[in-house]
Every structure is written in structure tokens, then in C-alpha cells.
């Protein structure tokens, strides 16, 4: 205690010192500024008053005070009303009591029903005028007129007292308000008055027989069997006894109580009418859908609604989809809810062309708007708009993806391992993406009662699955130990389900990659800077080079190199003839002078000048590049540069070192910042250009891999690289004339193996660059050729790595490759090298050690399938699915970087309208109001004129009875089907193996049974109708065509049988419900030689019969001499089948049985394969192919190689080059090309990567692994590429 006064004194002294210091400081400020503290405060206050933010805050404060005063006045007003009501009730009670006392009666606070002296009976009239009559069962003759009047007056008073009491209960919010209603009709009949939170007389919603929901009052709860029934009296007359899953609460549930799969009743606006329908919650609110709920209604429509437009179902079923009557809709909902959040949807943006199914036919349509998970489709033929769920199989990319698994299963029968079928290029067209609930806010379906969800949402990412094989060998090995039997590998090509179209050649560009083949002892030629050809010995013969410096500490920067400084002196041109002496002063004196430099910078180091000029053309500023030679000559085109190099005999500069793209900078360097780990060259001199390694995240070193830039044949693999197995040229001009070069001609002639058989004379390298993928491969000059290896324009991949790359550690994808300099479009980057294995050995090794670095050498299969139009899930031609009109128009402008122009995609801009309202939420469908109106009124008449929104195009009129309802007649068009078919036949050539559509790049073949069938999505007809034309003879055909032509401009085939489904295209007929097929059997038809003489007028549309008994999706067989099927324009209208699974497919399935996939392998295909599903087939005499045995069996090309049946595999796990580190991207900047260098064996091409676009320095190099999602059972691999077109999943 003695220390306490000392502490207090110390504090007081400290305070005194501080106050003195403050006073001194204030005095110093006053002396320095020359004003007093009061003046300074006044000056500061004035300055603050002048500030806009202060004035704004004061204004807001004044508004807040005004608002508070207003609210206080409103509260006072409400209190006054409450007091007045209380006084009125008190006065009323006093008046009632006085009146009772005058009558000699005793007043009690009880129900009026208890006071009744006579029992009453309730008579229910079960009609629409459901009125309740109360009939007295006593003797009416014993009453006097006076007593009758008194009783009527007392009943009126009691009713008034009850109304007042109800009002008081509502104001005071008494919890016991329901006790006043126990004396209701349910008590009199001995029924339940309460069932959980359901209480008699409460307001609820009930479902009527018209499938619509209406508000009403719960009047009774009855026990029926093991469950309960609820009697509802609707406000708009009528009563119904309903189950618990057919009534809903009359309040809006909180957002946290709703999850994906919740059963709700939601509002649906159709024009000016509002309906209440039951549905399933498909999306919970998030930023992308503008905080709205996506509802899948029971009848197949989808719509976004707000929380205030939802009502929860009282007693939903455990599996909510079982409450849906439509079987196909129920199947779709079950699949959707159980798979959530993995939702495959088509990635779309405004302006794209896509094929959409309607009434069993594929129509050309355009994307008008994308709103979250919905897309507004405009049908180009009749200008009709419709909102469709982006995951609906009515969209061709989704339909192709769904049918690809069935097609792959049929094609892969008998193999030891089923591999993904990947062969299409990824472009800006529609692709199927797998969305993930990455935010974790959405809740998955819980098969329990809604108030207590038990299943938490699935984590957005697996604990530690590397998204690419570069995620670290240690992590990969630990995962392989856990799942030794389920492994997956990248694919070096692109999926056929994607969309791509070529620009300069008849084949579409693609990303294909094949590994180069060569023995360990085979030497690889490369160019030295002096131009001499050197021979790189085998890895075993190379002496061990000294280890490069390795840094393991934090550095400010990686070792920097001096920047290039352009010379200041000008070059003047004097007229002369360029020759060898023009470059004499810059020819290098020593070997490898500029090795490791940016190849685009090397010409400048030899005194070339690269100048960029500008000029305005059509009000647009354009740029172009000019090279100025050391002798002063200006070179403006690649042709001039090529001529100059040959005239001067320049063997130290090459065509790939020059670039005329003004947006490619030759001196833009990328410098890593503060690396933790740095290696100068991880190849230890094995590559011509050093490959540095940088880790800017941690100190983890790269995996230990034996580096080899050559392919290494494994056990049982023999690659014939002898000169006798090669075709060589004898060119003396550097192979510039493709018509005279034998190697160039191999490349050109191989393009005839494409649909249509068109030869592209410009195929191959164009000035040492490849603008797009060539599906049939590139044949480079080889060691048998007599051309100069340094001057030859047909040698590129064999020269090895030229661009400067760097291995670096990514944030979430392991190790990756990035470029240190800009790379021009079409430039060669690197190859994919590794150990070549047989199929059987790869199966064994993949299951034991992992398959993440496997790549298929399937060049033979890809070209054969491409030639036949074999793939069922490939893109359509340029005027069909997946073409972006905006990209086509702006693709060649040259004034904007194409990779930066991504707008209005369904990922980055789900919702275009910022100021949305509830009116924009509702989707107007073409036949929505019509079908529902018929349900309401019980009529089967056609739609009235005002039952369609005004933006749906011309009004629909009834279909003439002569035309079958639900037929596949196209909407109005300028061309008739006859003209289309005639022009279509005239532009196609006849071949024995099949026929190809030169416009769509598709071809057809018949199945074994000889029946031309078109598979597709399933379709519903509400009334008994067929979806195709069953015409027996030619007269019927012509008559139907004539009627179709006459009525085409007047009708749009929208009748009671046509229903457009927002998310599910395949409901069945209400009468005689049967389960539709779960898969679609895709069959194609091959045209025979006799088709050349077929009559173009004999055209039938392949369609399915809704009443098929033994056949599925086949039209009626014609008689001899007639046709079995025809085609309208295959790019304009395609008919799909909706029957059950094909018998052929079932037979094949049962014969061999599906083989479960255990490993996923990359495919080295690099092109898009035309879709042939859902095709309409040209008519021909099919009598010769009615029996499957009459069709010849075609032998696979690979079987000519000693009967081989499986392709070879490249494994780069333990030994390979830098290609193994290239990561995946759904929007890659590299594509893959098969190149034949040291052998012309079709089984062993080199797999080369080329730039698909200009690439800025520092950008990671990626390509599309193209795994087939779901190809490996039980394995899921998410994608984190970050691209706008990201598909969400790899496996």
C-alpha cells in the first residue's frame, strides 16, 4: 500500500510534463505560423466546410435526421391507431355485455359454435360451386318469430366479436391465436386439427388437376391409411383432398433453407399472365445469376425467379424428383440433382451459330443472349425465339457429348482398354464445360426433409489432385498408391465434340501431337549458326557436360542479359543486284555466335533493321513491318525475304527468324522476379537452346527426369529409319516450288484423305510456319533428299528447339513452361519426346507407375475416322454449330489482338443487363401459354392469336389436316427442300467407300443391318401424332411437298403436339407412358455407287415414330426401286430419332460387353471431325444392303502392319523432353501436328507443338489434354486453367 501514493505522484508528474510539452509545442506552432491556435482551428474548420465530402456527409446526415423524424411520426401514428382500436374493442365488449344483461343472458368468452342449442350438419356439394349449407336438424315449429330474430341478432354480434378478436390477435402477435379456431368444422367431424406446423384454417397453396397451384385455406386434416390427406378450400371456388407433397406454405422461405433439389412452387410469367407451378431448385443465388434461383419446372421449362416468388412444399418426397409425372423430365432432374455441382453446360456467347433441336429436327439458330445458365436462341428459319437451359441436349454440343460415350463404347468393343476418342480442335465455338460450385455457397441435394439438411456441399476441389502431371512427383506417387487401379493420362489432341473450322485449307485446324520416333542410336541433325550441318550423337555418346550453376537462395532477379540497342546510323540503299557479297561484312566468323538468343532478334544482331510503319486505311490505323537489309534493301513481304536469303546465300539466317506481325516484339524480354531456385539449363546442353528453370514460389527443385530430346523405342518397338523406307526429293531451289518437291507433294496429296477428297495445294509450311493443323500430317525433307538442309524451306521440326523457354513453378498446376520472348503465330515450339511403348506394355506400366504422361500415336485411326466422317460428336461446318459470326468478321482486321477480344461469354458475363427486373426474369416460350391454357380449360383446340408473345414471330395458324401433325417440315425458308437436295447432290462426288458433303465435311455409312437411322434426343408428342412423314409411294411424297410449299409461309408448325422444353428435350406422351432410352444409338449410312442415278425428288426425312414397336427411329421401308431415306440440307435441317435403343447396338453390346476404362491416354490427333449424328440421309436404292452380310468389311490400315490392332504409346514419365511439362488449358495457345521426319511409317510420326496464336513473352504455353470427362471410372480431375472457356473438368 505504501507504493500507491508514489505511483499516483508519478502519474501526476508525468501528466504535468506532458501538458507542458503540449503547451510548448503549441507556442512553437503559433510563433512559426504567426497565428493563434484559435485562428488556426477556425481556418481548419472553414477549409473542412468547403470540402465536397464533408458537405456530402452533412447532407446525408440531414436526410437521415429527416428520415428518422418521419419514421418517428409513423410510429406515433401506428400507436395512435392501436390505441383507438383497443378503445373501440373495449367499447364494443362493454356494449355487448350490456346487451346481454338486458336480455338476461350471461356473456362468456367462448366460441359461438359452443353456444348453439341445436346441432348442425354440413352438406358438401362436390362441384365447382362448392358452397356449405347449414341445415338445422331440430323442430322449426317450436320456435317463435321473436326468438328467431333474437338468435339472428346474437349470431351477428358473435361474428362481430370474433372479427374484432382476430384483429387484436394479429396486432399483438399472440402465439395463442390459433386456439380461437379450434371450434371449427374439423372438431365437429372428429378430424385432426394440427399436423406438425400445419394447422387447420391456415393459409396454404394447393395443386389442382390442371397442374397449376392456387391459394386457399386448409379446412381439414384426415388420416388415410399410413399417411395424411389435407382438404383445401381454394379461394377461387372448389375443394380438393391433397397429399402433403401437393400443398405448399403461403410464405417465402429464407434463402439458406433452399438447396439444389428443393421442391418449391414458383411463379412463372407468360406475357401478362402469372402462373404458379411446381419445380425443383436448380441453382441457388450467386453473383453470376444476379442472386436469383434457377427453377426447373415439372413440364420441362426453366426460369430464373427471385426469393419473393417461391413457396416451399409442405411435405416433399425424400427423392424430390419422384414427384414429377413426366418420366423423361424426372430422369433429367434425377441425373442433374445427383451429379450437382458437376453440371455440363454449353459455353456460349452472343452471335454464335449453333444447331438446336425442335420437334425432332436440328435447326440452324443463333445465340441472342446469355443469362446465367439460360440462353436465348433465335431460330433463323422462322425468327422464333426461345430460352433454353445451357445443359439441355437440345443444343447440339450437349447432344454430341451425351452420345459420344455410346459411340465410343460401340467402337471400342474388344479392346483391352478403352481410351478417350479425341480428335477435334478447340476454337471459339460452343464447347461443353463442367461448372463447379467453387464458391462453396451452393448446397447440394439432400434426400431428407428440407429444414434439416444433412449432406454438406462437396468440397470444390479434391484434397490434392494435381491438375496436370507437373503438380509434383511426390504428390502424384502418393495418389497413385491410394488408387492404383484408377489412373488417368493427358491427351495430346482435342476432343471431337468441340468445334473448329479451317481458314485456308479444306481441313479444320486442330491440336494434334504425335511423338517423333527414332532409335537411341539415331542421330538428329541441327543447324549451327554458321550454317553447317552437325550431327548430334546419341545420349550415351555425349560426354557429361559440366553442371550449370544452381542458385538456392533468394535472388533479386535471375541473371539478366544486356538489352538490345538498335544502331543509330541510317542505312542507305544504292541500286544494285543483291548477291553473296551483300552480307559479307556481317557473316559470322565463329560458330554458335548467338546461340541462346531470341531467334527473332538474331537478324537484328546481324545488322538487319526491323521497322514498324503506320498508315490509315478506311479510317482505321494499320501497322506493317519492314525489314531493311545491311545493303539498304527494304523487304516488305515474306516472299521478298525468302528471295533475298537465297540470292545472298544466307545460311546463318533462316525464314523462321523473320516476322512481319507488328504486334510481335523482338526485344520484349521476360525477367522472373526474386527466384528461390534457379538453374541455367536443365537439359545440360542437350538442346540447342538452354532451358532455364525458375522457382519463384518455394525452394522445391524440378522432378528428376532423364532428359532426352529424341524418342526412344521401348521393348518390342522397331522403327525403320532406313533410307529405303523414305521418299526423297532432288530440289536445288530450297524446295520453294511445291509442285516439284516430292516431299511437299506427299503432304499435298495426303490432303485428299479428307472428306470431299479435295487436294489443298497450299498445305504444309508457309514460310517456315504452320498456320493451322494439317490432319493428314506434314512430310518434311529427310536424309535421302538432295536439298540443302540449311536452305530448305521444308525442314523445321527436325532442327529442334529454337525459341527460348523456361521451366517455372506455377501456383496450382505444378511445373509449367513459359516463353521468354514473343512467339509469332504458326511458329514451331517443341516436340513431345519420350519412350515408345506397345499397347499391352503401356497398360501394365500405366496401372503400376501411372499414366499421366501417356500419349497415343493414333495418326492412322484419326485420319481414317476423319475421312469417313466417322465421329458422331464433331463440329459442324462453318454455317452450323459453333461458328462465331463476330470472330469471322473481325478475325482478319489485324488491329486488335484476337486473344484479348472475349466478350459476352457465359463465364465472364453471365448477365448482360445491369438493371434487371422481375419482368426480365420470365422467359416467353412459344407454346407455353397454349398448352397450359388447354390444361386449364380441358380443351384441345389450337392456340389463339393473343396467346403468344409479340416477339415470337408471325402468328401460328392451325395445321391443315392433310399434313401430319408433328412432322419434320422445316419452317419458312427461301429455298425449297427439292432445290436444296438437288444442289446438295450436285456438289458431292461419288465414291465407293462413302460419300462426303463438301460443305459440311461429313460423310455417312450404313450400319450392318442396312437401315439408315438417325439417332438423337428423345421427343414428346402430347397428343397422338407422329414426328415424321410415313409416306409409301412417290405420289405421296410429291403431294406432301406441294402442301408443304404452299403452307410454308403461313405456318410455323406450332400445334397442341409441339412443346418446347427449356432443359429436357425428351418427354413422352401422357397416355401410355414408357421410359425413353437412356442412351442414343447413333448410326450412319454409306452411299453406294447406285446413288448417282437416284432421283433427287425421292426424299424422305428420317424421323422416329412415337409408337415404334420393334424399330427405333426408322422410317417405313420403301418398296423395291424406291428409297429408304433422304436428306434435306445436312447443315440446315437434321432429323433425330427418339425411339428406344437400337437393336443393333444392343446386340453388339450383349455380344462383347463393355470394357471398363482404367487409364486415359492422350491422342495425337489434331483435327475436328464432322458430326454425322442426327443426319438426314440421301435416298438411294438400298436393296443391295438390306442384309448386313452383303456389305464388304473394310480392313483397317494398321492391320497391314503384320496384323497390328493397337496404336503405340509415348511415355514421358521417366525419360522425355520439355514437352512433358506443358500444362493443360481449355483455351490453349499451342496446337499439335503430326510430322514425318526420319521415317514414313505412318505409325511413328513426330509430335510437334506449334503456336496457334501470337504469344506474349512470359505467357505460359499450354495445350488441350482433351481428356474425356468420365472416361476413368471413379476418378475426377478439376480444371484450374482459368480460361473464359474453361470446361471445369478434365476427367
From Swiss-Prot:
It catalyses: N(6),N(6)-dimethyl-L-lysyl(9)-[histone H3] + S-adenosyl-L-methionine = N(6),N(6),N(6)-trimethyl-L-lysyl(9)-[histone H3] + S-adenosyl-L-homocysteine + H(+). GO terms for biological process: DNA methylation-dependent constitutive heterochromatin formation; heterochromatin organization; methylation; negative regulation of gene expression; transposable element silencing by heterochromatin formation. The modification N6,N6-dimethyllysine is found at residues 1170, 1178. Degraded by the proteasome, shielded by interaction with ATF7IP. It comes from the Eukaryota. There is a cross-link at residue 1032 (Glycyl lysine isopeptide (Lys-Gly) (interchain with G-Cter in SUMO1)). Zn(2+) 1 binds at residues 729, 731, 735, 741. Gene3D superfamilies: 2.30.30.140, SET domain. It holds the Pfam family MBD. It is found in: Nucleus; Cytoplasm; Chromosome. Changing residue 867 to R: Not monoubiquitinated by UBE2E. Loss of methyltransferase activity. Residues 257-320, 347-403 form the Tudor domain. The modification N6,N6,N6-trimethyllysine is found at residues 1170, 1178. Residues 528-539, 1100-1115 have a biased composition (Low complexity). Residues 448-468, 951-963 have a biased composition (Pro residues). It is an enzyme of class 2 (transferase). GO terms for cellular component: chromosome; cytoplasm; intracellular membrane-bounded organelle; nucleoplasm; nucleus. GO terms for molecular function: chromatin binding; DNA binding; histone H3 methyltransferase activity; histone H3K9 methyltransferase activity; histone H3K9 monomethyltransferase activity; histone H3K9 trimethyltransferase activity; histone H3K9me2 methyltransferase activity; promoter-specific chromatin binding. Changing residue 1224 to K: Abolishes methyltransferase activity. Residues 108-147, 404-545, 868-1160 are annotated as: Disordered. Residues 803-1266 form the SET domain. Its EC number is 2.1.1.366. Histone methyltransferase that specifically trimethylates 'Lys-9' of histone H3. H3 'Lys-9' trimethylation represents a specific tag for epigenetic transcriptional repression by recruiting HP1 (CBX1, CBX3 and/or CBX5) proteins to methylated histones. Mainly functions in euchromatin regions, thereby playing a central role in the silencing of euchromatic genes. H3 'Lys-9' trimethylation is coordinated with DNA methylation. Required for HUSH-mediated heterochromatin formation and gene silencing. This is Histone-lysine N-methyltransferase SETDB1. It comes from Homo sapiens (Human). The gene is SETDB1.
Amino acid at each position: 500500500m505504501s507504493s500507491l501514493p508514489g505511483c499516483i505522484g508519478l502519474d501526476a508528474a508525468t501528466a504535468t510534463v506532458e501538458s507542458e510539452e503540449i503547451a510548448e509545442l503549441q507556442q512553437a506552432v503559433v510563433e512559426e505560423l504567426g497565428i493563434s491556435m484559435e485562428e488556426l482551428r477556425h481556418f481548419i474548420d472553414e477549409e473542412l466546410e468547403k470540402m465536397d465530402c464533408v458537405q456530402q456527409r452533412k447532407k446525408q446526415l440531414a436526410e437521415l435526421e429527416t428520415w428518422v423524424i418521419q419514421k418517428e411520426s409513423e410510429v406515433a401514428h401506428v400507436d395512435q391507431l392501436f390505441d383507438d382500436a383497443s378503445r373501440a374493442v373495449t367499447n364494443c365488449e362493454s356494449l355487448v355485455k350490456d346487451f346481454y344483461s338486458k336480455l338476461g343472458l350471461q356473456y362468456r368468452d367462448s366460441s359461438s359454435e359452443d353456444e348453439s342449442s341445436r346441432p348442425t350438419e354440413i352438406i358438401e356439394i362436390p362441384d365447382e360451386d362448392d358452397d356449405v349449407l347449414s341445415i338445422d336438424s331440430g323442430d322449426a315449429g317450436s320456435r317463435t318469430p321473436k326468438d328467431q330474430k333474437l338468435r339472428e341478432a346474437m349470431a351477428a354480434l358473435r361474428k362481430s366479436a370474433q372479427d374484432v378478436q382476430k384483429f387484436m390477435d394479429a396486432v399483438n402477435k399472440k402465439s395463442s391465436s390459433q386456439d380461437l379456431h379450434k371450434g371449427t368444422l374439423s372438431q365437429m367431424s372428429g378430424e385432426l386439427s394440427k399436423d406438425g406446423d400445419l394447422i387447420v384454417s391456415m393459409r396454404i397453396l394447393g395443386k389442382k388437376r390442371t397442374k397449376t397451384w392456387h391459394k386457399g385455406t386448409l379446412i381439414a386434416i384426415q388420416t388415410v391409411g399410413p399417411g395424411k390427406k389435407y382438404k383445401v378450400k381454394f379461394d377461387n371456388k372448389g375443394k380438393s383432398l391433397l397429399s402433403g407433397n401437393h400443398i405448399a406454405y403461403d410464405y417465402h422461405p429464407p434463402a439458406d433453407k433452399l438447396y439444389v433439389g428443393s421442391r418449391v412452387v414458383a411463379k412463372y410469367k407468360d406475357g401478362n399472365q402469372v402462373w404458379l407451378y411446381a419445380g425443383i431448385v436448380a441453382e441457388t443465388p450467386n453473383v453470376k445469376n444476379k442472386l436469383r434461383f434457377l427453377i426447373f419446372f415439372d413440364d420441362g421449362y426453366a426460369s430464373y425467379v427471385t426469393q419473393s416468388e417461391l413457396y416451399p412444399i409442405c411435405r416433399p418426397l425424400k427423392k424430390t424428383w419422384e414427384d414429377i409425372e413426366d418420366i423423361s423430365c424426372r430422369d433429367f432432374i434425377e441425373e442433374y440433382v445427383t451429379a450437382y455441382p458437376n453440371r455440363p453446360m454449353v459455353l456460349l456467347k452472343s452471335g454464335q451459330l449453333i444447331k438446336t433441336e425442335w420437334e425432332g429436327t436440328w435447326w440452324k439458330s443463333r445465340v441472342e443472349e446469355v443469362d446465367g445458365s439460360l440462353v436465348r436462341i433465335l431460330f433463323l428459319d422462322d425468327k422464333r425465339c426461345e430460352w433454353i437451359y445451357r445443359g439441355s441436349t437440345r443444343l447440339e454440343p450437349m447432344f454430341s457429348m451425351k452420345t459420344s460415350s455410346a459411340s465410343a463404347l460401340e467402337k471400342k468393343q474388344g479392346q483391352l482398354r478403352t481410351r478417350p476418342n479425341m480428335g477435334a480442335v478447340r476454337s471459339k465455338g460452343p464447347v461443353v464445360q463442367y461448372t463447379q460450385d467453387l464458391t462453396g455457397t451452393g448446397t447440394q441435394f439432400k434426400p431428407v426433409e428440407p429444414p434439416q439438411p444433412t449432406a454438406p456441399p462437396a468440397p470444390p476441389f479434391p484434397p490434392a489432385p494435381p491438375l496436370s502431371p507437373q503438380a509434383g512427383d511426390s504428390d502424384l506417387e502418393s495418389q497413385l498408391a491410394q488408387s492404383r487401379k484408377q489412373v488417368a493420362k493427358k491427351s495430346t489432341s482435342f476432343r471431337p465434340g468441340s468445334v473448329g473450322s479451317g481458314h485456308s485449307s479444306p481441313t479444320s485446324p486442330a491440336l494434334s501431337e504425335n511423338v517423333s520416333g527414332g532409335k537411341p542410336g539415331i542421330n538428329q541433325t541441327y543447324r549451327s549458326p554458321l550454317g553447317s550441318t552437325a550431327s548430334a550423337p546419341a545420349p550415351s555418346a555425349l560426354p557429361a557436360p559440366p553442371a550449370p550453376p544452381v542458385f538456392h537462395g533468394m535472388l533479386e532477379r535471375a541473371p539478366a542479359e544486356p538489352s538490345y540497342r538498335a544502331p543509330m546510323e541510317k542505312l542507305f540503299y544504292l541500286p544494285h543486284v543483291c548477291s553473296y557479297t551483300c552480307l559479307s561484312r556481317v557473316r559470322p566468323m565463329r560458330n554458335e555466335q548467338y546461340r541462346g538468343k531470341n531467334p527473332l532478334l538474331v537478324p537484328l544482331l546481324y545488322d538487319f533493321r526491323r521497322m514498324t510503319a503506320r498508315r490509315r486505311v478506311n479510317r482505321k490505323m494499320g501497322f506493317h513491318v519492314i525489314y531493311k537489309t545491311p545493303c539498304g534493301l527494304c523487304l516488305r513481304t515474306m516472299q521478298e525475304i525468302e528471295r533475298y536469303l537465297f540470292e545472298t546465300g544466307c545460311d546463318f539466317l533462316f525464314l523462321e527468324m523473320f516476322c512481319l506481325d507488328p504486334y510481335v516484339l523482338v526485344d520484349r524480354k521476360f525477367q522472373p522476379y526474386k527466384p528461390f531456385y534457379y538453374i541455367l539449363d536443365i537439359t545440360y546442353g542437350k538442346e540447342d537452346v538452354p532451358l532455364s528453370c525458375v522457382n519463384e514460389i518455394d525452394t522445391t527443385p524440378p522432378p528428376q527426369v532423364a532428359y532426352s530430346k529424341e524418342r526412344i523405342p521401348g521393348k518390342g518397338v522397331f522403327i525403320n529409319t532406313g533410307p529405303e523406307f523414305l521418299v526423297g526429293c532432288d530440289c536445288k531451289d530450297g524446295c520453294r516450288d511445291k509442285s516439284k518437291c516430292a516431299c511437299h507433294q506427299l503432304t499435298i496429296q495426303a490432303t485428299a484423305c479428307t472428306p470431299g477428297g479435295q487436294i489443298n495445294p497450299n498445305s504444309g509450311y508457309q514460310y517456315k510456319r504452320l498456320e493451322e493443323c494439317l490432319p493428314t500430317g506434314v512430310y518434311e525433307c529427310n536424309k535421302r533428299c538432295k536439298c540443302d538442309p540449311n536452305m530448305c524451306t521444308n525442314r523445321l521440326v527436325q532442327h529442334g528447339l529454337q525459341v527460348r523457354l523456361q521451366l517455372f513453378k506455377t501456383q496450382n498446376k505444378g511445373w509449367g513452361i513459359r516463353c521468354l520472348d514473343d512467339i509469332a503465330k504458326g511458329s514451331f515450339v517443341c516436340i513431345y519426346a519420350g519412350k515408345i511403348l506397345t499397347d499391352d506394355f503401356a497398360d501394365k506400366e500405366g496401372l503400376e507407375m501411372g499414366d499421366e504422361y501417356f500419349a497415343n500415336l493414333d495418326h492412322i485411326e484419326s485420319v481414317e475416322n476423319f475421312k469417313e466422317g466417322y465421329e458422331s460428336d464433331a463440329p459442324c461446318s462453318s454455317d452450323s454449330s459453333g461458328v462465331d459470326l463476330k470472330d469471322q468478321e473481325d478475325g482478319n482486321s489485324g488491329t486488335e489482338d484476337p486473344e484479348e477480344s472475349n466478350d459476352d461469354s457465359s463465364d465472364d458475363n453471365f448477365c448482360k443487363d445491369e438493371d434487371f427486373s422481375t419482368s426480365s426474369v420470365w422467359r416467353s416460350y412459344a407454346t407455353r401459354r397454349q398448352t397450359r391454357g388447354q390444361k386449364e380449360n380441358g380443351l384441345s383446340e389450337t392456340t389463339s392469336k393473343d396467346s403468344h408473345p409479340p416477339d415470337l414471330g408471325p402468328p401460328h395458324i392451325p395445321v391443315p389436316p392433310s399434313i401430319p401433325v408433328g412432322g419434320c417440315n422445316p419452317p419458312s425458308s427461301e429455298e425449297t427442300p427439292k432445290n436444296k437436295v438437288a444442289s446438295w447432290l450436285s456438289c458431292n462426288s461419288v465414291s465407293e467407300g462413302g460419300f462426303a458433303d463438301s460443305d459440311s465435311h461429313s460423310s455417312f455409312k450404313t450400319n450392318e443391318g442396312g437401315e439408315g437411322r438417325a439417332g438423337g434426343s428423345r421427343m414428346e408428342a402430347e397428343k397422338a401424332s407422329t414426328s415424321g412423314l410415313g409416306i409409301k409411294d412417290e405420289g405421296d411424297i410429291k403431294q406432301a411437298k406441294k402442301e408443304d410449299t404452299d403452307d410454308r409461309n403461313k405456318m410455323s408448325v406450332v400445334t397442341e403436339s409441339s412443346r418446347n422444353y427449356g432443359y429436357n428435350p425428351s418427354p413422352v406422351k401422357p397416355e401410355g407412358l414408357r421410359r425413353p432410352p437412356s442412351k442414343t444409338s447413333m448410326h450412319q449410312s454409306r452411299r453406294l455407287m447406285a446413288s448417282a442415278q437416284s432421283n433427287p425428288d425421292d426424299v424422305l426425312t428420317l424421323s422416329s415414330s412415337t409408337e415404334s414397336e420393334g424399330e427405333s427411329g426408322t422410317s417405313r421401308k420403301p418398296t423395291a426401286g424406291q428409297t429408304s431415306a433422304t436428306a434435306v440440307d445436312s447443315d440446315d435441317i437434321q432429323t433425330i430419332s427418339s425411339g428406344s435403343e437400337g437393336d443393333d447396338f444392343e446386340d453388339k453390346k450383349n455380344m462383347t460387353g463393355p470394357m471398363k476404362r482404367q487409364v486415359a491416354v492422350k491422342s495425337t490427333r489434331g483435327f475436328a471431325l464432322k458430326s454425322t449424328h442426327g443426319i438426314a440421309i440421301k435416298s438411294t436404292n438400298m436393296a443391295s444392303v438390306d442384309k448386313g452380310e452383303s456389305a464388304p468389311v473394310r480392313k483397317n490400315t494398321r492391320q497391314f502392319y503384320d496384323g497390328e490392332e493397337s496404336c503405340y504409346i509415348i511415355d514421358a514419365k521417366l525419360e522425355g523432353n520439355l514437352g512433358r511439362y506443358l500444362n493443360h488449358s481449355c483455351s490453349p495457345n499451342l496446337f499439335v501436328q503430326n510430322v514425318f521426319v526420319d521415317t514414313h511409317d505412318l505409325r511413328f510420326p513426330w509430335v510437334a507443338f506449334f503456336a496457334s496464336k501470337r504469344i506474349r513473352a512470359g505467357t505460359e504455353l499450354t495445350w488441350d489434354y482433351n481428356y474425356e470427362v468420365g472416361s476413368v471410372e471413379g476418378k475426377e480431375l478439376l480444371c484450374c486453367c482459368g480460361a473464359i472457356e474453361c470446361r471445369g473438368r478434365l476427367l
